[in-house]
Amino acid sequence: MGLSRIAFTNLRNISSLKLDTSARLLLFHGNNGSGKSSLLEGVYLLGRGASFRTKELDYAVSHLSDEMVCFGEAVNEDAGKSFRIGVSRQKTGKLTRVRINGESARTLSELAAALPILIVTPDTFGFINGGPGERRRFVDWGVFHVEHQFKVVWQNWRKLLLQRNKLLKSGNISRSELSAWDNQYVAYSDEISRYRDAYFAELKEILIESLKESSEQTRDIGDKLTITLSNGWYQNDVNHMDQLASSVESDVKKGFTTLGPHRADIKVKVGGVHAKEVLSRGQQKTLITHLYLSQLEILRRRTNQRPIVLIDDVGAELDTGNQVTLLTRMLEKGAQVFVTVLDKQQSEYLFGHFNQEYDTQMFHVEQGAVTKVHN
């Protein structure tokens, strides 16, 4: 999968942009505020219908306009087919329109399935030390793209969670009514856990294999690594209905459900100690890099899909050697990679390193304008 061309209008400081993006590796350099991250934001919008920079999509629309439009043409090389994606946002009425081949998409998940996009930002490298939400999203992104039924199960579970929370907040709770909701809630929760557990077992196996094959340093981490996925319950071997029943009083006081898939988390330990306590910042980055590479490998094995990877400010958290390693492994797995770089010399170095083996393009970004530097 790859984007062959993009066209953005009124996306932050990008007033109008048309770009051939058919290369495997695309490097964008420019000063802070030049529009590099906005360009990646536009590509991300094509695959997610949302922004990775803000929860309020209106902020992505130029302050000089009421409407933003992002267009992309993607090519599935294996199937020999191309398709078009369009995402627009109007500030007036806060209206977002999504079209695939001219037809309105009913849900954003249709967009995500059509154009798998994985993003790596400086925040990504807080995976180990950050909150559990980011780690859950990491797992669910992977499951969504390899298990087609997961979306339906997740949506049904989410509706039940919201309904249960509404009932808890009402203060007018019938135990029999709550029990009826809980039966369905537990059933869907357990199904989500089964999908996650199966995916995570495969991810863990590939991750450890990847670490052991990379270098002596990562091999040592792989030998001592234990990575586990908790499913959001107090105890997995204790009946989940009983656990929900015992937590009702606490849930009523808090006004929300405290047990279930939304409380799941990943624990990473090395030699039995939390990774953040024993791994240097550099070692943590290496481990997280291998996690994302393992996710790409599962996608390749299970679906033969090759996603689009966006890397924002690659030099912020990785030195040159690790940048080359990350990009090499991603390109080897068939990904199309968009990279933003602050330093022109670094961009030129990466271009020179990769251009002989992979079709590489380099661009300069300034005040929302993008100029091709190398073919």
Curated annotation (Swiss-Prot):
Coiled coil: none annotated. It comes from the Bacteria. GO terms for biological process: DNA replication; DNA synthesis involved in DNA repair; double-strand break repair; SOS response. GO terms for cellular component: cytoplasm. PROSITE patterns: RECF_1 (PS00617). The keyword Lyase does not apply. This is DNA replication and repair protein RecF. It comes from Hahella chejuensis (strain KCTC 2396). The gene is recF.
